[in-house]
Every structure is written in C-alpha cells, then in structure tokens.
C-alpha cells in the first residue's frame, strides 16, 4: 500500500528542485546539464519523428483481427510504449554524458542545504573520479536494460502487450527515474548501489511519485530542457532529509559513507 504522505513528499521534493536551481550559488553548475540536455533532446526528437510510424506499425500488426474494434485504444498504449522506449534511451545517454556534472551539482546542493564543507580537490582529482562515476551509470544500465527488453518484447503479445504492459513499463520507468537521480548524492558518499536501491524501496511511494513527476516533465516541451538539474537538486534534498543521517550511522563498505568523493572544480 502506497503511503499518501510519501506521495505528497515526492511532489514537495520535485518542486524544491525547481526552487534550488534558481539559487545564486547553484546557477553556474546547472548550465552544463541544460546544454547537454538540449543537444540530446534535439537528436532524439529527430529520431523519434523519423521512426515512430514504423514502430507503431510493428506493434499494431501484433493485434489479432478479433480485437480490431479496440484499435484506437490500443494505438494509444502502443504510442505510450514507444515514448517510454525513447525516454529510456535519453536518460541512459544523458546519465553517461552528464554524470560528472550531475555529481558535482548534487555535491553543491548538499553543501548549501547542510552548511557543511564537503571534501574538495583539484581538477585532476575530479578527472580521476570520472571512471567510478561512469561505472555507476553502467550498474544502472545493467539493472534496468534486461527488464525493459523483456517488457518491450511482451508488448508484442496480443492484449497483454497493449493493456497491462504499458502500465508496468510506466511504473518501472518512474522507479528508474528515482534511482537515476537519487543515486548522485548516494554515490557522492560511496553508498553501494544495492544499498541505495534498498533504501529507495523502503520509501517506495516517495520514490515513485518523485520519479513519476520527473518522467512526466520529460515529455513537456521546454520544461524537459531543465528537468535533469531540477531532478538532481530535488533528489539531493530528499537524500539530506531522509537518508543522509541514517546511512552515516552505519558502515556500508570499507571506504565508509562519510567522505564525499565528488570534488569541486570551482569554489
């Protein structure tokens, strides 16, 4: 049973993300994710326009003749599945390309919210940390891709693929959005990936409502240009309130979680 209070909190942290990106000390760290977002969305929009007719045709051919009277409704679900597929491609690419910048933004947001000085280092220290950040993105991909492939293939199953599967895909995508953006502050503290998933699962309603709003805004023109830094800021605020003190109380790995690994380039 999803908690009504947690659902409201997900909305709160998402709106808090919008507030945080306007703060003076954070604006310069928001610019690069936005620029990368514009480039990626432009390329994927072109790909979507050129391929959507072909993909819809493939999905609609899987519908048996005796369900032709449902074709209009099933067409909507087919389009939804394709949108989610392109959304997954977008978030995967943006995750790999913008990971260092998002980690840095999460660090700055946490510093602003807590008032604590986080570990800072040189540009070289930052560069050395990039492979670890990209490795974390690879973990997310390994976790999500097999599940999405299975769901996509099930989308070709008559009736099931055009009714139940799109709903499951939507919920799973919302869950992945929570994982994608909440992971930046978790990873800054070297919290293992499996621990991060378990913590978010304990507050599933909070995670799904936050991730669902991020997913929804990705489909809104212009709004989707800034949704990545908004999500990073909101997820970091969620980390500070719900997870930071709790996880700092127990040793999660040999390196611990008290040291922030993402370094500052600009003081």
From Swiss-Prot:
Membrane topology: Multi-pass membrane protein
Regions that span the bilayer: 29-49, 73-93, 149-169, 212-232
Main location: membrane
Keywords carried by this UniProt record: Amino-acid biosynthesis, Cell inner membrane, Cell membrane, Cysteine biosynthesis, Membrane, Sulfate transport, Transmembrane, Transmembrane helix, Transport
Localization of this protein: Cell inner membrane
InterPro entries xref list: CysZ_sulfate_transptr (IPR050480), Sulfate_CysZ (IPR022985)
GO biological process, any: sulfate assimilation
GO cellular component: plasma membrane
Gene Ontology molecular function: any one: high-affinity sulfate:proton symporter activity
NCBIfam families: PRK04949.1
Family to which this protein belongs: Belongs to the CysZ family.
Function: High affinity, high specificity proton-dependent sulfate transporter, which mediates sulfate uptake. Provides the sulfur source for the cysteine synthesis pathway.
Identification of the protein by name: Sulfate transporter CysZ
Taxonomic path: Bacteria, Pseudomonadati, Pseudomonadota, Gammaproteobacteria, Pasteurellales
Gene this chain is encoded by: cysZ
